[in-house]
């Protein structure tokens, strides 16, 4: 299978977010890469589902709380940017203050 660098990056995001969701379900606090992967995956899937950019940003900013992450992680993530594929093409989605 020949994958482009972008496809490899997407697979890495989805793989890490899968692990992160499982750890979150077990009650573990998430580290920086795990938190970013969940926020990113939520935005990418929302776009794929046909939601608007605004709805994707809102949903991705509510997927995690400070209680879900290790101390200090929320402060390390002022925003998350991801190029997501919507029904009408690719758009850059910026999720501001994604962990509240």
Swiss-Prot record:
Keywords: Cytoplasm, Hydrolase, Virulence. It catalyses: urea + 2 H2O + H(+) = hydrogencarbonate + 2 NH4(+). GO terms for molecular function: nickel cation binding; urease activity. Its EC number is 3.5.1.5. One of its GO terms (cellular component) is cytoplasm. CDD domains: Urease_gamma. The keyword Lipid biosynthesis does not apply. One of its GO terms (biological process) is urea catabolic process. Pathway: Nitrogen metabolism; urea degradation; CO(2) and NH(3) from urea (urease route): step 1/1. It comes from the Bacteria. The keyword S-adenosyl-L-methionine does not apply. It holds the Pfam family Urease_gamma. It is an enzyme of class 3 (hydrolase). InterPro entries: Urease_gamma, Urease_gamma/gamma-beta_su, Urease_gamma_sf, Urease_subunit. It is found in: Cytoplasm. Heterotrimer of UreA (gamma), UreB (beta) and UreC (alpha) subunits. Three heterotrimers associate to form the active enzyme. PANTHER family: UREASE. Belongs to the urease gamma subunit family. This is Urease subunit gamma. It comes from Yersinia enterocolitica.
């Amino acid at each position: 299978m020949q994958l482009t660098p972008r496809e490899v990056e997407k697979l890495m995001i989805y793989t890490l977010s899968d692990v992160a969701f499982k750890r979150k379900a077990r009650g573990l606090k998430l580290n920086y890469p795990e938190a970013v992967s969940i926020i990113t995956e939520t935005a990418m899937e929302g776009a794929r589902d046909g939601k608007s950019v605004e709805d994707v940003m809102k949903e991705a900013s509510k997927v995690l709380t400070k209680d879900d992450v290790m101390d200090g992680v929320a402060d390390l993530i002022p925003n998350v940017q991801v190029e997501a594929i919507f029904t009408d093409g690719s758009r850059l989605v910026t999720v501001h203050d994604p962990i509240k």
